[in-house]
Amino acid sequence: MNYYIADTHFGCTNKYEDRTLEHDKLIKENWNRVVRNNVDTVYILGDIGREGSNKDNEYLCEIISTLRGRKVLIQGNHEGMKDARLRQLFVEITPYKEIIDNYNGLNHRLVLSHFPILFWASQHKGSILLHGHTHMTDEQKFFKKSINDLNEFFKDKTLKGYTDCPPARAFNVGCMLPYMNYTPRTLKEILKSGE
């Protein structure tokens, strides 16, 4: 089973989002409740945590090593991944990835990026963008509005090459979103969220 989550920010405290280290404990508990070890794959769409100093890296290694599943990191704006101890905790580290995930007997092409992208690979052929980065900010509201505007634009039947294309679908998998509830989610859960 594949799971998706972004913006865990382990080791970061933040007054803006009222985030304390208790969030780390909550995410870890939720993660290990749903993810099976050595069976499930978790795609972490960036900003996994605070890295840099030796102390920060040790804390991050400690947390990540206790999380179940095979971990694939899609790099965000906070990942330098210079520390070999951190890198070895992931089966793959990449800035962008396209995969196929199955839900309800259908294969779905997914584009995984930390950053929201207005135009992504095969979006008008039904591919789905999963992203993070924008948390629950005005940037996220703007991006959702942009996707809605784009879908309205492509309803114009006079546009060449875009007739009968499905609407663009993009989902923010930031852990702090209410439907994510600090828990890695399956594609089924994400699609049913209506986010």
Which residue ranges define each predicted feature?
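Conserved beta-sheet core of the metallophosphoesterase superfamily
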Residues: R87-E195
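Catalytic metal-binding/acid-base residues of hydrolase active sites
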Residues: H9, I48-G49, N77-G80, P116-I117, ...
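Short amphipathic alpha-helical segments and helix-helix/interface helices
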Residues: N32, L60-S65, Y96, K160
